[in-house]
Swiss-Prot record:
Active site: 205
Lineage: Eukaryota, Viridiplantae, Streptophyta, Embryophyta, Tracheophyta
Species, as recorded: Arabidopsis thaliana
Homology family: Belongs to the protein kinase superfamily. Ser/Thr protein kinase family. ZRK subfamily.
Family matches, as PANTHER family: PROTEIN KINASE SUPERFAMILY PROTEIN-RELATED, WALL-ASSOCIATED RECEPTOR KINASE-LIKE 21
EC numbers: 2.7.11.1
Gene from which the chain derives: ZRK7
Keywords from the named record: ATP-binding, Kinase, Nucleotide-binding, Transferase
Name of the protein: Serine/threonine-protein kinase ZRK7
Enzyme kind, highest EC tier: transferase
GO BP, one annotated term: cell surface receptor signaling pathway
Length: 269
């Protein structure tokens, strides 16, 4: 399976090769349709045909991602009503219903601090690539009609691990058997992220709010916006330090204000 390269989000009935026509992040119109060109990982592409986003591998295989209209998103969330919100991070998670199905809607609201716009599209690309894994929150589709992409995911009945018990409720400690099950399943998902693709991809933001649980207590890893690929033949990559205080390695997180910090990764299999 190839990883992502030229992500071409094209709202038209015909897939066009925009690689020679656009710069990263450039938006323009042609024939009444809006186009967005975005460059990410190597050897693949994300395109849109007849309302369906497609991630293409170098072998020509496509992974369809459904596109939802802004009307569907606004109706599902009652115009992003806060009473529908079930979690807040760099984005807001809303519980909604689309076509009689409960869904989880991820909306990047406002200007996330120190957040590269590329991360929005990386989240779509990596989430789609990972959605076949049983321990990853399945991406159902997205909406490109807002200033930033809105992601639509499967709805995990028990919610985020960080909020088990709900606001104001007495939270009973999870049984050790459940904790070990969650740890193993997330480890399986991370191992898949590290080893399934031609380049190792590092999540960089593992925390309780990014782990969801379904009705069977099956763990689901989510939120790949901060993920980064390790160049072939390398053990690490230089990038701006990012993550969440309290969940990263202390020395690493203490350098959050550094312009760059060497991220060294060794994958254990």
């Amino acid at each position: 399976m190839a990883h992502i390269s030229d992500i071409k989000l094209i709202r038209t009935d015909t897939t066009l090769d925009l690689s020679q026509k656009a710069e990263k992040g450039m938006i323009w119109t042609m024939g009444g349709a809006s186009y967005l060109y975005y460059n990410a990982y190597d050897h693949g592409s994300l395109t849109c045909r007849c309302g369906t986003l497609l991630i293409a591998s170098s072998g020509g295989k496509y992974n369809p991602i459904r596109t939802f209209s802004s009307h569907q998103i606004l109706e599902a969330t009652n115009n992003f009503d806060w009473s529908y919100a079930i979690g807040v991070d760099r984005f807001v998670w809303y519980k909604g219903t689309i076509e009689n199905r409960a869904v989880l809607i991820k909306y990047y609201k406002g200007e996330p601090f120190n957040f590269d716009p590329d991360n929005f599209y990386r989240d779509i690309a990596v989430s789609s690539m990972m959605s076949s894994h049983k321990n990853v929150l399945k991406l159902l589709g997205c909406c490109l009609e807002f200033p930033r992409p809105v992601l639509v995911c499967e709805y995990p009945e028990k919610g985020a691990l960080a909020y088990i018990g709900g606001a104001g409720e007495v939270i009973k400690p999870l049984a050790w058997s459940v904790r070990l099950k969650i740890a193993k399943e997330i480890a399986d998902a991370v191992t898949y992220l590290h080893t399934e693709f031609p380049r190792t991809i590092i999540h960089r933001d593992l925390k309780l709010t990014n782990i969801f649980l379904d009705e069977n207590w099956t763990a689901k890893l989510s939120s790949f916006s901060l993920s980064i690929p390790i160049p072939e033949g390398e053990l690490g990559v230089e990038d701006i330090v990012c993550g969440t205080q309290g969940f990263g390695e202390p020395h690493y997180m203490e350098n959050m204000d550094s312009i760059k910090n060497r991220l060294m990764v060794t994958v254990i299999t």
